[in-house]
Curated annotation (Swiss-Prot):
Coiled coil: none annotated. The keyword Transmembrane helix does not apply. Located at the top of the head of the 30S subunit, it contacts several helices of the 16S rRNA. In the 70S ribosome it contacts the 23S rRNA (bridge B1a) and protein L5 of the 50S subunit (bridge B1b), connecting the 2 subunits; these bridges are implicated in subunit movement. Contacts the tRNAs in the A and P-sites. This is Small ribosomal subunit protein uS13. GO terms for biological process: translation. SUPFAM superfamilies: S13-like H2TH domain. GO terms for cellular component: cytosol; small ribosomal subunit.
Length: 118
């Protein structure tokens, strides 16, 4: 298994699919990386040489991925909560942020129903 950005990439998968195992790299970005490094998208990881894997490592290192990206996202959410803006308040209350109705739906975000006390 090749190790890129601290993640073990599966050998038996195609390059594009294997790169999507890294948090922060989807299909589009994986294709862009393959095009920039001139590595075939349908080549399996085990078929690549060490030099090609090193080139992939350098290309992935140009993007914010894995722990840095997770930290950045959580810091953005924390910033919204500290500001006390509408989105921050909705995050704090674990409610939907983008205008969805909450009278009848939003069970995933709100959690299981709480029984009514009399």
């Amino acid at each position: 298994m090749a190790r890129i950005a601290g993640i073990n990439i599966p050998d038996q998968k195609h390059t594009v699919i294997a790169l999507t195992g890294i948090f922060g790299i989807g299909r589009t970005r994986a294709r862009a990386i393959c095009a920039a490094t001139s590595i075939a998208e349908d080549a399996k990881i085990k078929e690549l040489s060490e030099a090609q894997i090193d080139i992939l490592r350098e290309a992935v290192a140009e993007y914010t991925v894995e722990g840095d990206l997770r930290r950045e996202v959580s810091m953005n959410i924390k910033r919204l909560m500290d500001l006390g803006c509408y989105r921050g308040i909705r995050h704090r209350r674990s409610l939907p942020l983008r205008g969805q109705r909450t009278k009848t739906n939003a069970r995933t975000r709100k959690g299981p129903r709480k029984p009514i006390r009399k």
